[in-house]
């Protein structure tokens, strides 16, 4: 009886609120609120010696609790923390050729190694056993990034009895990645690090001129950590027609991750708070993912634990990962596949069009970015859920054309502090932060009112796709967010 009474009272309170309007709601989003929330994340990180928000660490726990408490105290949402256990990994490393040290980054979940050995250049992209020369045994395999997951390359190198592996980038600049937790049916990993394209090419030239020896040391640490997603759904609105949006709460080891992805989660939090002034026709679900940087673990866990009925209640998913890059471009996920010949599930084209129309309405240029599997939309796409979102670029280099569009610096990364210690409050572009947060608010208000542009989903197709959700090596290549010209989070750096 008490629950029925409370539901009746809640319905009455919500009924007294005006329906959220896409024309007006974006104006409720203020820069000062975005910056206040971002500062809180930096404070969490800098309160501890690690100065980061890696999943399962104290600053990340503080982040999760902050989001939970801020949403809970509104009284507008049903909020819970979803517990899960994931394997954490970190490593120190050195790579030398003679007395010269080469910058290298150990891939997440790599085993340890200490070896001095010649380099063996692997044919093609190292994605099949035939690519590994017979004399790779006991040597360090040098493999080009591309085509298959880093975990596959590492396993194949181990099968060829390589002493260790080096993967070099296929675009300018350094690289890192994740192997994904080891899969017993695949075989053990070889120790593996990533280096830049330039350093990879130097090693190839030395190897072609004669043998070249490297000294590689990797000290890898791993432990299971308990961590949490935060889920908050409006108490009002149709719970069978859910508008879902999300971003990830964790950073890499190197820094506090205030753009990657503090910008996305704080934008969503500010929007969630502002939404409490209004009523909605369709339920809105805010999702805050853990352990994205280790292979989209939180979002994969969440989606894999939904049955077909619950999956079909989610009419669409919007992803916001790095929306305030300092040298930004305004990028929209290519839902219709017109730019990258890879469309999202039915309804994704309409999401892309909504964001395009919004930017057009305020005379802002925009470009598409690829659904490359490198952020938390992947599990939703693989389950047939229409998806979309925004991105402002990571380690990718801004072109002259894009610099002219947004007044940025050509020849410079969209985010020069991507996955680095400098991804703090000073790394945020305030203009991009506010523009994209207002665009997000517009989308939320639109779909909270009307989902008629998004086709109903089919249970059978969802079940068919679901089996593919938990991929053996996590996301794809480095979050280079493969995004068109922006690259991005190695969230995905599972795939070369």
Curated annotation (Swiss-Prot):
Organism: Aspergillus oryzae (strain ATCC 42149 / RIB 40)
Annotated Zn(2+) 1 binding sites: 248, 260, 321
UniProt keyword annotation of Metal-binding present: yes
Function field: Extracellular aminopeptidase that releases a wide variety of amino acids from natural peptides.
GO MF entries: aminopeptidase activity; metal ion binding; metalloexopeptidase activity
Thermoactivity: Optimum temperature is 55 degrees Celsius. Retains 65 and 46 percent residual activity after a 20 minutes incubation at 70 and 75 degrees Celsius, respectively.
Site (Transition state stabilizer) residue list: 418
A UniProt-annotated Pfam family: PA
Protein name: probable leucine aminopeptidase 2
SUPFAM superfamilies, A to Z: PA domain, Zn-dependent exopeptidases
GO BP terms in the entry: proteolysis
């Amino acid at each position: 009886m008490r629950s029925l009474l409370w539901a009746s009272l809640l319905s009455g309170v919500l009924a007294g609120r005006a329906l959220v309007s896409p024309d007006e709601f974006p104006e409720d989003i203020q820069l000062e609120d975005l910056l206040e929330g971002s500062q809180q994340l930096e404070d969490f990180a800098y309160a501890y010696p690690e100065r980061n928000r890696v999943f399962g660490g104290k600053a990340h726990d503080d982040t999760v609790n902050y989001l939970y408490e801020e949403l809970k105290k509104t009284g507008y949402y049903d909020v819970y923390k979803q517990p899960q256990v994931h394997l954490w990994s970190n490593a120190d490393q050195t790579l030398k050729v003679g007395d010269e040290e080469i910058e290298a980054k150990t891939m997440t979940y790599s085993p340890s190694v200490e070896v001095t050995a010649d380099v063996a250049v692997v044919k093609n992209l190292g994605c099949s056993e035939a690519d590994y020369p017979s004399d790779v045994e006991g040597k360090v395999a040098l493999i080009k990034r591309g085509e298959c997951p880093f975990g596959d390359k590492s396993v194949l190198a181990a099968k060829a009895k390589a002493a260790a592996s080096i993967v070099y980038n296929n675009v300018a600049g350094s690289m890192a990645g994740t192997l994904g937790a080891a899969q017993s049916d695949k075989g053990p990993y070889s120790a593996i690090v990533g280096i830049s394209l330039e350093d990879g090419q130097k090693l190839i030239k030395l190897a072609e001129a004669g043998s070249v020896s490297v000294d590689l040391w990797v000290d890898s640490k791993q432990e299971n950590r308990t961590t949490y997603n935060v889920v908050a759904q409006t108490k009002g609105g149709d719970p069978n027609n859910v508008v879902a949006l999300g971003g990830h709460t964790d950073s890499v080891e190197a820094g506090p991750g205030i753009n990657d992805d503090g910008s996305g989660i704080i934008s969503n939090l500010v929007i969630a708070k502002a939404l409490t002034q209004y009523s909605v026709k369709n339920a809105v679900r805010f999702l805050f993912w853990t352990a994205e940087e280790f292979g989209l673990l939180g979002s994969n866990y969440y989606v894999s634990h939904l049955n077909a009925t619950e999956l079909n209640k989610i009419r669409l998913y919007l992803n916001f990962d790095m929306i305030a890059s300092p040298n930004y471009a305004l990028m929209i996920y290519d839902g219709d596949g017109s730019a990258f010949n890879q469309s999202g599930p039915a309804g994704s084209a309409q999401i892309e069009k909504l964001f395009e129309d919004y930017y057009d309405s305020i005379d802002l240029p925009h470009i598409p970015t690829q659904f490359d599997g490198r952020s938390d939309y992947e599990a939703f796409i693989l389950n047939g859920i229409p998806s979309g979102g925004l991105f402002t670029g990571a380690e990718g280099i801004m072109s002259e054309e894009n610099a002219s569009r947004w007044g940025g610096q050509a020849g410079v990364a969209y985010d020069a502090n991507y996955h680095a210690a400098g991804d703090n409050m000073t790394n945020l572009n305030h203009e991009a932060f506010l523009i994209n947060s207002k665009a997000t608010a517009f989308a939320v208000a639109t779909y909270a009112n009307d989902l008629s542009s998004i086709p109903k989903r089919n249970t059978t197709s969802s079940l068919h796709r679901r089996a593919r959700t938990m991929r053996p090596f996590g996301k794809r290549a480095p979050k280079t967010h493969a995004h068109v010209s922006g690259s991005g989070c190695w969230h995905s750096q599972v795939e070369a």
